[in-house]
Amino acid sequence: MKKLLFFILIPFLGIAQDFTANGINYTITSRTAPFTISVTDNPNFTGAAEIPETVAYNGNRYIVTAITRGAFMHCNNLTSVTIPNSVTTIRENAFADCPDLTSVTIPNSVTSIGDRAFSGCTGLISVTIPNSVTDIENGAFAGCSGLTSVTIPNSVTTIRENAFADCSGLTSVTIPNSVTSIGDYVFGGCSGLTSVTIPNSATTIGDGAFQDCSGLTSVTIPNSVTTIGNFAFERCSGLTSVTIPNS
């Protein structure tokens, strides 16, 4: 029984809260120079979260480098987030299901946005992904039904499964020339999407990538594409014109 208890406790040690500053909880990730911390669980946080680059604690100044898994998940009254230039990683579910979140600033220091990081943020209207990000992970912005505009930089090479699925407010998307792979169901359920630009760099369009995009009227698939997945354009009831390349 003691052994079982030991293994149950281990997962919780990684998300322990070490201290709170200005209403935000942090966990220490390095106690030696350079001193670093991550933003950890903040249940029931309300209002605007302004995360600083550094935080003083016990005589040391700590650099904020990451926002941990589920840090603000289900914070129904979180309205905006400012992420500092010191942060490189936003982990999975970090801001998932925050319906009142309308504004987020993601700095150029961020290289990784985790799975479902902003999924279910129905109040989010626009997102600019910085040019430091190379992959948009699984379901990163899925279910953001209020999202009308997204800027994808030329640094992105892969858009993974469900990244923008069910973003029903999204009307137009330009996929940059750097992208080589459009994952499964990436824009599935984006019923408001009327136009999409697929770049000459893309070689693969995944299963169901544009499934249920009922507002889509035309699409041109470039010669670079060699694989179009199953159901890629299924139930696109408004689609009247498709150009498929010889490739």
Q: For the regions a protein language model found, what residue spans apply to each?
A:
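Boundary at the C-terminal end of the N-terminal hydrophobic targeting segment
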Residues: A16-G23
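Consensus positions within tandem repeat domains that build extended binding/scaffold surfaces
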Residues: T68-A71, R91-A94, G114-S119, E137-A142, ...
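Short amphipathic beta-strand and strand-loop transition segments with alternating hydrophobic
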Residues: N25-S30
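Secondary-structure transition/turn motif
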Residues: R31-G47
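Intrinsically disordered, low-complexity boundary segments flanking structured domains
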Residues: I8, Q17, I37-V39, D115, ...
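Structural signature of tandem-repeat unit edges
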Residues: G23, F45-A66, N76-T89, P99-S112, ...
